[in-house]
Amino acid sequence: MGKAKADEMEIWTKDEFQQFADCLMDKRVSWLAYQILFWTGLRIGELLALTFADVDLEGKVITINKSYQRLKGKDVITPPKTPKSNRKVNIPQFLVEDIQDYKDSLYDPQLEDRVIPVTKTFLEKEMQRGMKLSGMKKIHIHSLRHSHISLLIDMGFTALAIAERVGHESIDITYRYAHLFPTRQVEMADKLDSLKNEKGV
């Protein structure tokens, strides 16, 4: 990702995402797909390749080991984008419950079944529908990944920890998101003020 692309990066905050997602609760598969994308930072191909065997609800872990594409009308499973893309992603309890509820609603799901058995085109259309219904600013589906990374940066996690979670080859890629939170400089100055006053320097 070049500097120009980084500067143009658009994201949703947690509240913006919630408003969007609330408008898609009529389609469970769509709603869950966006929940997973926003709260894990998975790439769209990684999400669509997930099978129930890859999702350990008891251990609260998703294993990423493949990617999905739809080529010439056929489902194609390929290796992940990069070696670092092979990873395990821990998921929060609320997402475990969302996936379990969804799984319980299905008729006899098998381990080899895809969790989200749709295409990227379907999810892109559903995203357009959700943005129209919610009035949210328009972003691309890949921007849900940007939103997750930006959320983690804002929560104070290190670039290394974030890079491992989202499968970046280098922490340099993760650092390119930092410009999204210019107030961090102000926070740093404020904390230095507080530190000086506490120590009576």
Where are these regions (language model features)?
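C-terminal secondary-structure termini that scaffold catalytic or DNA-interacting sites
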Residues: G59, K72, T78-N86, N90-L95, ...
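Catalytic-site neighborhood detector that most strongly recognizes the C-terminal catalytic loop/helix
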Residues: K3, I11, Y68, A159, ...
